[in-house]
Curated annotation (Swiss-Prot):
Its EC number is 4.1.1.31. Its cofactor is Mg(2+). Signal peptide: none annotated. One of its GO terms (cellular component) is cytosol. One of its GO terms (molecular function) is phosphoenolpyruvate carboxylase activity. InterPro entries: PEP_COase, PEP_COase_bac/pln-type, PEP_COase_Lys_AS, PEPCASE_His_AS, Pyrv/PenolPyrv_kinase-like_dom. Belongs to the PEPCase type 1 family. The active site is at H138, K546. Forms oxaloacetate, a four-carbon dicarboxylic acid source for the tricarboxylic acid cycle. It comes from Escherichia coli O81 (strain ED1a). This is Phosphoenolpyruvate carboxylase.
Length: 883
């Protein structure tokens, strides 16, 4: 174990040294000395030296406005480098990687050793594997794309430096390259100047596909195939594609007025353009590789006399011409030109697949399997995973927008006001119209801009090539009519196929009603006919936690899933649960394997569909090797959850969870909603107001510009509390509830739940992780620098609460200290704290200066503003999961 850490530590200190040299070259010895002094003070402050802690605070408070930015940048860049070293560590032969792709082998061996599972059962479970990862543009990815590219290259240098046999001159060359990259990063502005547009966000998503997934997915399938051959003697079929990627970038218009129908149309074209671009590179390689002459009669018949000399090349060159013509047409469309569709335009995956597969079969039949299973097989697998659309898009819109559109329409038609009808009347109207053969929308109707936008979006879906749009997600869904309304709007747009429409249940009440809503829908004959035995439901993690606190929310999510699984099973419907979880604990994030195995039994039968958000995309898919590792973890977890499902919780455990849920929700809401001091405290103790200035995502931070916590989006809410290290949304209420149940004499029952029920042990594990990242002296320092004295008692109360919570969690988990069973994560948090602490102290100081200036009516000092942005980005890097 320690050898693993020493490799990581030596990389971290080597990168730190290079950064130090860069700072010295750029700004001189005195700034480097200042940074070094602060680092040493921070280290001994962490080790418990109070005098040094005081000195650290004084030093940072006394920095001049000129020193603020370089010091903030030094620690922020250091954390980016530490994250890069850690990312490399997770895939290096000396580090964690030694164990990751092994996950599949371990899982297969574990399954084979179960007497009740035959090899055939395991094989069937593998064949039905389905994993759909939905990339979302969350503003939490605050690192600029240009810096991400440089960090990827730093990673590559670390990999080569790990090779013990490199010659001295190569070693020197690599070190020189590292110095260049770190200097380039230092001299690059790490804060975006402008908010990204939805199209920029989509391009960021395509960059992830190009730089990592394109190579990572075929590598993962090779790995999976090897493990299956070794352990089960089973080969994956060529067309097997368990992984799909979908994106919300350019499709998610919920609360984001910048995502319009035109934007979605543009992103769909852009996505197809990028696919042709990537496939052209693949085909170019195949043109040079497939120079073979021998072919089957079927292939020769396909190429005719003209191509008989080099049949494989002939087919590849033809495909290349079609791709080029398609790309040229898409390019013209993106520029706004209206061109007739060219002959041979590629719109369907089959058109890509058929010539490639014909070559594959012929090579296999002629004894050239070794060639068939090279680059050609990788390309075939990319056709199945990415295909013509590259990534599919989800459309997401809030339920009230559909209700308002239909209200405007019924008023125009003079048949009443849909918005004020009862649920039963709405359903009757919708079902009547869904069954009607005549159109509902009058030709000469001029709807409002809002309604026109909703109708135009449905039009885009109807016109898009089939297979390029994955699902229509309805946020804040509350009733069956919310789902039927979307089906009606899609029918009116002339959509010719059954588009999956997924209600998203995201508040506590909506989660509790989810099963009733779906039961009512499944009782409608017309609806049952339409969905053809398949239903997708999305479970919202972040908004439910913001609404009720993390303990009540997670229990409501569990129960909603459990009830939906049973309802759909009874109705013979294949249910896909779509999990909208974020990177941070307060938004449902948890280590993947643990999180999946803690769901109700049967929840992964319809496959896994999950959002991957913001910075988590980079941590989990930023490099091909990490992609292999993340996909392997998911694969192992899905197989295990489906073949060895977790136990049904005992009735007494459910009762305890009900109790915990009620108590924790009351405590949480008692502070967040009912305590009149809470919102002013939140606004002053965290950088919430300042966060709005960061050019983070393309969507506004608030659903409504004025208003309390409920109008804040879940992301800024969590982001703000992560910055001041109180991490409040991820624990408030949970520990108090546990304490109450312990006092009622049920500690041994809680210990049994922790031991034998994955759902409960994962909850406690997530609390431990949050407590390990939280920091009470820093949270207290923010109060002292920024909060009105009258509100100090509230801050103290919350900090005392957290201390009590830590004790009760450790007692139930039988641990002597936090993260006892995950020393690697504890180590990684400790390593980063030394660099994050000064940024926190500095941030409190900067907030103090900037708010003082505002109070005195002065213009904000650009150096202070810039340094503040840098601390926000740096702390986000230090916490590793921002919002």
């Amino acid at each position: 174990m320690n050898e693993q850490y020493s490799a990581l530590r030596s990389n971290v200190s080597m990168l730190g040294k290079v950064l130090g040299e860069t700072i010295k070259d750029a700004l001189g010895e005195h700034i480097l000395e200042r940074v070094e002094t602060i680092r040493k003070l921070s280290k001994s402050s962490r080790a418990g030296n109070d005098a040094n802690r005081q000195e650290l605070l004084t030093t940072l408070q006394n920095l001049s406005n000129d020193e603020l930015l370089p010091v903030a940048r030094a620690f922020s860049q250091f954390l980016n480098l530490a994250n890069t070293a850690e990312q490399y560590h997770s895939i290096s032969p000396k580090g964690e990687a030694a164990s990751n792709p092994e996950v599949i082998a371990r899982t297969l061996r574990k399954l084979k050793n179960q007497p009740e599972l035959s090899e055939d059962t395991i094989k069937k479970a593998v064949e039905s594997l389905s994993l759909e990862l939905v990339l979302t543009a969350h503003p939490t990815e605050i690192t600029r794309r240009t810096l991400i590219h440089k960090m990827v290259e730093v990673n590559a240098c670390l990999k080569q430096l790990d090779n013990k046999d490199i010659a001295d001159y190569e070693h020197n060359q690599l070190m020189r390259r590292l110095r260049q990259l770190i200097a380039q990063s230092w001299h690059t502005d790490e804060i975006r100047k402008l908010r990204p547009s939805p199209v920029d966000e989509a391009k960021w998503g395509f960059a992830v596909v190009e730089n990592s997934l394109w190579q990572g997915v075929p590598n993962y399938l090779r790995e999976l195939n090897e493990q299956l051959e070794e352990n089960l003697g089973y080969k994956l079929p060529v067309e097997f594609a368990p992984v799909r990627f979908t994106s919300w970038m350019g499709g998610d218009r919920d609360g984001n007025p910048n995502v319009t129908a035109d934007i979605t149309r543009h992103v769909l074209l852009l996505s197809r353009w990028k696919a042709t671009d990537l496939f052209l590179k693949d085909i170019q390689v195949l043109v040079s590789e497939l120079s073979m002459v021998e072919a089957t009669p079927e292939l020769l018949a396909l190429v005719g006399e003209e191509g008989a000399a080099e049949p494989y090349r002939y087919l590849m060159k033809n495909l290349r011409s079609r791709l080029m013509a398609t790309q040229a047409w898409l390019e013209a469309r993106l520029k706004g030109e209206e061109l007739p569709k060219p002959e041979g335009l590629l719109t369907q995956n089959e058109e890509l697949w058929e010539p490639l597969y014909a070559c594959y079969q012929s090579l296999q039949a002629c004894g050239m399997g070794i060639i068939a299973n090279g680059d050609l097989l990788d390309t075939l697998r990319r056709v199945k995973c990415f295909g013509v659309p590259l990534v599919r898009i989800d459309i997401r819109q809030e339920s009230t927008r559909h209700t308002e559109a239909l209200g405007e329409l019924t008023r125009y038609l003079g048949i009443g006001d849909y918005e004020s009808w009862s649920e039963a009347d709405k359903q009757a109207f919708l079902i009547r119209e869904l069954n009607s053969k005549r159109p509902l929308l009058p030709r000469n109707w001029q709807p409002s801009a809002e309604t026109r936008e909703v109708l135009d979006t449905c039009q885009v879906i109807a016109e898009a090539p089939q297979g390029s749009i994955a699902a229509y997600v309805i946020s804040m869904a509350k009733t069956p009519s919310d789902v039927l309304a979307v089906h009606l709007l899609l029918k009116e747009a002339g959509i010719g196929f059954a588009m999956p429409v997924a209600p998203l249940f995201e508040t506590l009440d909506d989660l509790n009603n989810a099963n009733d809503v779906m039961t009512q829908l499944l009782n409608i004959d017309w609806y049952r006919g339409l969905i053809q035995g398949k239903q997708m439901v999305m479970i919202g993690y972040s908004d439910s936690a913001k609404d009720a606190g993390v303990m009540a929310a997670s229990w409501a999510q569990y129960q909603a899933q459990d009830a939906l699984i049973k309802t759909c099973e009874k109705a013979g419907i294949e249910l896909t649960l779509f999990h909208g979880r974020g990177g941070s604990i307060g938004r449902g994030g948890a280590p993947a394997h643990a999180a999946l195995l803690s769901q109700p039994p049967g929840s992964l039968k319809g496959g896994l569909r999950v959002t991957e958000q913001g910075e988590m995309i980079r941590f989990k898919y930023g490099l091909p090797e990490i992609t292999v590792s993340s996909l392997s973890l998911y694969t192992g977890a899905i197989l295990e959850a489906n073949l060895l499902p977790p136990p049904e919780p005992k009735e007494s455990w459910r009762c305890i969870m009900d109790e915990l849920s009620v108590i924790s929700c009351d405590v949480y809401r008692g502070y967040v909603r009912e305590n009149k001091d809470f919102v002013p405290y939140f606004r002053s103790a965290t950088p919430e107001q300042e966060l709005g200035k960061l050019p983070l995502g393309s969507r506004p931070a608030k659903r409504r510009p004025t208003g309390g916590v409920e109008s804040l989006r879940a992301i800024p809410w969590i982001f703000a509390w992560t910055q001041n290290r109180l991490m409040l949304p991820a624990w408030l209420g949970a520990g108090t509830a546990l304490q109450k149940v312990v006092e009622d004499g049920k500690q041994s029952e809680l210990e049994a739940m922790c031991r034998d029920w994955p759902f409960f042990s994962t909850r406690l594990g997530m609390l431990e992780m949050v407590f390990a990242k939280a920091d009470l002296w820093l949270a207290e320092y923010y109060d002292q620098r920024l909060v009105d004295k009258a509100l100090w008692p509230l801050g103290k109360e919350l900090r005392n609460l957290q201390e009590e919570d830590i004790k009760v969690v450790l007692a139930i988990a039988n641990d002597s200290h936090l993260m006892a069973d995950l020393p690697w994560i504890a180590e990684s948090i400790q390593l980063r704290n030394i660099y994050t602490d000064p940024l926190n102290v500095l941030q409190a100081e900067l907030l103090h200066r900037s708010r003082q200036a505002e109070k005195e009516g002065q213009e904000p000092d650009p150096r202070v503003e810039q340094a503040l942005m840098v601390t926000i980005a740096g702390i986000a890097a230090g916490m590793r999961n921002t919002g």
